[in-house]
Swiss-Prot record:
Gene Ontology CC terms: plasma membrane
Segments on the Cytoplasmic side according to the record's topology features: 52-64, 114-144, 206-220, 282-319
Pfam families: 7tm_1
Record gene name: Mrgprd
Listed Gene3D superfamilies: Rhodopsin 7-helix transmembrane proteins (1.20.1070.10)
Keywords assigned by UniProt, alphabetized: Cell membrane, G-protein coupled receptor, Membrane, Receptor, Transducer, Transmembrane, Transmembrane helix
Protein name per its UniProtKB record: Mas-related G-protein coupled receptor member D
GO biological process per UniProt: adenylate cyclase-activating G protein-coupled receptor signaling pathway; angiotensin-mediated vasodilation involved in regulation of systemic arterial blood pressure; G protein-coupled receptor signaling pathway
Organism: Rattus norvegicus (Rat)
Membrane-spanning segments: 31-51, 65-85, 93-113, 145-165, 185-205, 221-241, 261-281
Amino acid sequence: MNYTPYSSPAPGLTISPTMDPVTWVYFSVTFLAMATCVCGIVGNSMVIWLLSFHRVQRSPFCTYVLNLAVADLLFLLCMASLLSLETGPLLTASTSARVYEGMKRIKYFAYTAGLSLLTAISTQRCLSVLFPIWYKCHRPQHLSGVVCGVLWALALLMNFLASFFCVQFWHPDKYQCFKVDMVFNSLILGIFMPVMVLTSAIIFIRMRKNSLLQRRQPRRLYVVILTSVLVFLTCSLPLGINWFLLYWVELPQAVRLLYVCSSRFSSSLSSSANPVIYFLVGSQKSHRLQESLGAVLGRALQDEPEGRETPSTCTNDGV
C-alpha cells in the first residue's frame, strides 16, 4: 500500500501516437476509471442528499448507509484527483508529489473506513438474524451512530500512523513503514474481510431458508447487503492485496502497470456501485418511472419482509 513515497505507477508516461500497447491500455483503463469516478460521485452525493435532507422511509441501517456513502464519495474524489495528477502535468513536480501523497493517504483512509463500515453492516444484520429478540428489544438505541464514529476514528488512527512512518516528508524509514503496513493490512485482510464473508454467508443461508419455507421474496435489505458485499469483495479486493503483490512478488513493469490501473478501475467501480444497487433493489417494475428517488431508496433500506412494508421515519441517531 505504501511501497514508495510518491508511487505513481507510470512515471513519465504521456499520450502520444507512438505509445506501446501497454501504455495505450493503461491510459484507456485510467480514463474509464475517471468516468466511473464521476458517475459514482454523482450517485453517492445523491444518496447523501436523500438521507440527510429528505424525509424518506428509513431502516435502522440508514446511519450505516449514509456513512458508507460518505466514505465512497471521499474515496472517489481522491481517486479522480490521483488519476488527474498522473495523466496530466497539472502542478509542478514538488507540489504534485505532496498533493499526490496527501490524496493517496486520504484515499486509503476512505477505503479503510468503507471496508469497516460494510463489515459492520453485515455483522449487525447477522446479529439481528441470529438473535432477533435481543436485537429488537435490547440493542442500544444509538448503537449505529456509536459504531460508525468508532470505525471512522479507527480508520483515521490507522492511516495517521501509516502516514507518519511511510511518508518521506515526515519519517522516511522504509523498514518501519513495512512493519506498519504488515500489521494494518493483516488487520484488514485477516479480520475485516473474513468477518464480512462469514456474516454474509450466514445472512445468505438464512435468507434462502426463509424463502424456501415461507415461499416469498427475501427482504430487500438482505439483497442490498449481500450484493454490496459481493461487489466489494470482487472489485475492491485487488486494491486490498495490492501491497502484497508489490512487496513480495517480482512482476514485470508492464504487468505491475496493468495490475495497478485495473485494480484502481475495479475499486472505483465498487465505490460507485452501491447507489445503483439501492435504486435497482428498491424500485418496483410497475412504478419504476413514477416514483421519487427518496421512496425508492427508502424501500431498498426497509427492514421489513415483502408485503409488510410500513412507513417508518427514524432519525439517523435513533436507530
